[in-house]
Amino acid sequence: MAKKKGDQYDSDGAEDQDYDEEPVFEDPAGFVDDVGDDELLGDFLKQKPCESDGVENVIVVDNIPVVGPARFPKLQGVLEKIFKNAGTIVNIHYPKDDEENTKGFAFIEFKNPEMAEEAVKAFNNYRLDKSHTLLVNLFSDFQKYSDIPKDWSPPESQPYKVQNDLYTFLSEPDAQDQFCVVAESTPGAVQVQFWHNTQPEPVELLTRERFTETYVKWSPLGTYIVTFHKQGVVIWGGSSFTKINKFAHSNTQYVDFSPCEQYLVTYGPNGQKIIIWDIRTGTEKRSFVSDGSSNMSMFRWSHDDKYVARMGDNAIHVYETNTFYLLDKKSIKVQGIRNFSWSPTDNIIAYWMSEDIDAPARVTLLEIPKKIEVRNKNLFNVADCKIHWQKSGDYLCVKVDRYSKSKKDKKDADVKFLGMFYNFEIFHMREKDIPVDSVEVKETILAFAWEPVGSKFSIIHGEPSNANVSFYEAKKGQEPTMLRKMEKKVCSHLFWSPRGQFIVLANLQMGSFEFVDTNDFTIMKSGDHYRASEVEWDPTGRYVVTGTSGKVKEDHGYHLWSFQGRILKRVNLKNFMLFLWRPRPPTLLPDERQKEIRKNLKKYYAQFESKDRVRMTRASKELLEKRAKLREQFVEYRAKRVNDWEEQKYRRMQLRNNMDTDTLEADPDNVEEEIVEILVREDTTLLE
């Protein structure tokens, strides 16, 4: 046991323990160590020397053309141009015969093994020309496959492991949502609490101390929660959040799930690799070397997990997830590409390319896997573009920052744009030939947001201290029409309800919020949460949470609001870091069944109200019992303190010259009485 410094000596200054005796560090009898070296020393054991060191960063490229000395430089240039895309090449060796002709294969050495693995995945079966398809293998694989034993033995059957039910959170009888609260309990130790959002008081499900080292993140459908550790990340699930799988990637800074939760992407620190994992098996599907720049969400997924894409130099690299090879074994060349984004419901990529000397800027919609341009729009005098998909995939908005003129600064190479104005190009994705409408705004744009379910979109424009909020609607076959312009609003962010119709106008610097119903554009309620830095809607659109993170030195915690802006709960939590609602998967009910339920919703009201009354009655009874118990505890505590106070009376009188000062009447000669008159109000009554 560790001892405090002050406990090393007793009151006489003598040592209370003989420290000459050596401590015993042996394990107690019967101790079983269930933690292996791989888990404790994973990073260190990776550096253990092995026989393959020195050759694991070498690849063998077979089926290259056999050429003589005259054509050799051209072959050399072509292969170097291809394989330098996988990483830094250290050396290339071309074996030759007596006549200096190449033998049809070559050895390429890369800077590290990760680059060699990337070259194998990217360029194996690469079609060089009509007669030559490259076969690429790791040099170390030759030894591995040559050591396969001749006598085959069947694999041993493994005992069946009972799997956790990962979807118990969806079977809650009243469909109450879950949320987690993250707070730093001690420096370097993060506590995570899991709650059910029951009314009138939430019910705590579980509390995990030291659950993560930094923060947590839910998967898109709410099946898993991921935690971050020095050795890598771990995903948890089930009713008690048991460990599902772990992924060894040291110092992971960020993770990203695919939309259908089949794959997980872990991003290491700048300069390290990025890994795509299969969530269920825990196997590494593909790895990439970071270029050292900001790489958060560098990979973007199609809605069905069939494709993943990333942007390169004048190209989009689209990979098929069944093999993680490039689609059609080649990238999509796009000169001057600046950004791209997948449709949330279709395999369509929207990208924009900047202006060139002889060509305007351009927005293009590309259908995958056919690589057919289904729509494009030329744009002129473009400084920047932002791509905004509507959640249902019905509309696409491209915010275009345009300028009247530009000039180049003599001191630096930066271009300055003058006379800025803004266009919103609205693509109607469900209509024939995808018509495009344009909305022009002269004022500075502060924020833009689509209604997730519906056809409205909102814009904050003007000066931050005196902004306007405009609401538009994009109807089929019509140009977008302005529904309402709300003037002189001090807001900076827009947060739509996931069910549409309701929106929160937020100013995260001042902590002020306005709750608006966009059916008639009434402001239902306004509220404040000083220094709030985050806003989170629950999946049902019934509740909103605002929170103050650890960046604020005081008033940590979160507020729970109804969708109408009524404050329901204030929670102050020391070192509060994060509040996250648990996502829900899409409903399995078909559209026809949903419409039928909405049509007959009134007949369910009585049932819901009855449940609410029973719940509130039960909650009121529990609340009264809780208060009575707290009162009993207080009375008991007060009685103990009064008893202690009475026992200390003799000591108090000793300190006060044997004078009893417990009551004013004890020593009337030592009491001064002063009468103070205060004028509270003066009334004048006229008598007629």
Curated annotation (Swiss-Prot):
Keywords: Coiled coil, Cytoplasm, Initiation factor, Protein biosynthesis, Repeat, RNA-binding, WD repeat. It is found in: Cytoplasm. Residues 9-25 have a biased composition (Acidic residues). SMART domains: RRM. GO terms for molecular function: RNA binding; translation initiation factor activity; translation initiation factor binding. Residues 612-643 form a coiled coil. Residues 57-141 form the RRM domain. Signal peptide: none annotated. InterPro entries: EIF3B, eIF3B_RRM, Nucleotide-bd_a/b_plait_sf, RBD_domain_sf, RRM_dom, TIF_beta_prop-like, WD40/YVTN_repeat-like_dom_sf. It comes from the Eukaryota. WD repeats lie at residues 208-246, 247-287, 291-329, 332-367, 440-482, 527-572. One of its GO terms (cellular component) is eukaryotic 48S preinitiation complex. The keyword Magnesium does not apply. Residues 1-28 are annotated as: Disordered. GO terms for biological process: formation of cytoplasmic translation initiation complex; regulation of translational initiation. PANTHER family: EUKARYOTIC TRANSLATION INITIATION FACTOR 3 EIF3 -RELATED, EUKARYOTIC TRANSLATION INITIATION FACTOR 3 SUBUNIT B. RNA-binding component of the eukaryotic translation initiation factor 3 (eIF-3) complex, which is involved in protein synthesis of a specialized repertoire of mRNAs and, together with other initiation factors, stimulates binding of mRNA and methionyl-tRNAi to the 40S ribosome. The eIF-3 complex specifically targets and initiates translation of a subset of mRNAs involved in cell proliferation. Belongs to the eIF-3 subunit B family. HAMAP family: eIF3b. Component of the eukaryotic translation initiation factor 3 (eIF-3) complex. This is Eukaryotic translation initiation factor 3 subunit B. The lineage of its organism: Eukaryota, Metazoa, Ecdysozoa, Arthropoda, Hexapoda.
